[in-house]
């Protein structure tokens, strides 16, 4: 039995926690734990503080479901943004990615999960903000195509134009794995859904 490893419970627990982060394997987790625990403990303390602050202050916007540190996010409270377009995305991280492109100046709506979509509240928002177009910014998959059709069907009485970002985004690939030029081109070449 390896008693050396058994004597490093705290270190191995840190490795185990880091390994649970998406795209971090055992070797990377070990390197990070070693760096934080031995080579740069000041960074570890800053990271601990940043994590505590994020957990205390991060929430979702009550209007669009994007990440926010207040009840209404900065995008929803920005009166200079175009109200006629609403870009629907699957995850809050998609808002970050699309905002970095600086191609879209409208509003967002993050679905998170189709099971929890409050279509009544969404419809009230569409009317209140005078939305005329919903842009689906979903990665191209059969499931997402079905989701777009479902949403169109639920909102057909609202007399909206439904568009989706153009193909060119590879099927089955998440936004964070696509270069900004391809994503920007796909967004600006969106087509009627």
From Swiss-Prot:
InterPro entries the UniProt entry points to: DNA_Rcmb_RecR, Rcmb_RecR, Rcmb_RecR_Znf, TOPRIM_dom, TOPRIM_RecR
Keyword field: DNA damage, DNA recombination, DNA repair, Metal-binding, Zinc, Zinc-finger
Alphabetized SUPFAM superfamilies for the sequence: Recombination protein RecR
Any Pfam family matching the protein: RecR_ZnF
Zinc finger (C4-type): 61-76
Domain Toprim as annotated: residue spans: 84-170
Keyword match Protein transport: no
Ranges in a coiled coil: none
NCBIfam families for this protein: recR
Function: May play a role in DNA repair. It seems to be involved in an RecBC-independent recombinational process of DNA repair. It may act with RecF and RecO.
Family: Belongs to the RecR family.
Name of the protein this chain belongs to: Recombination protein RecR
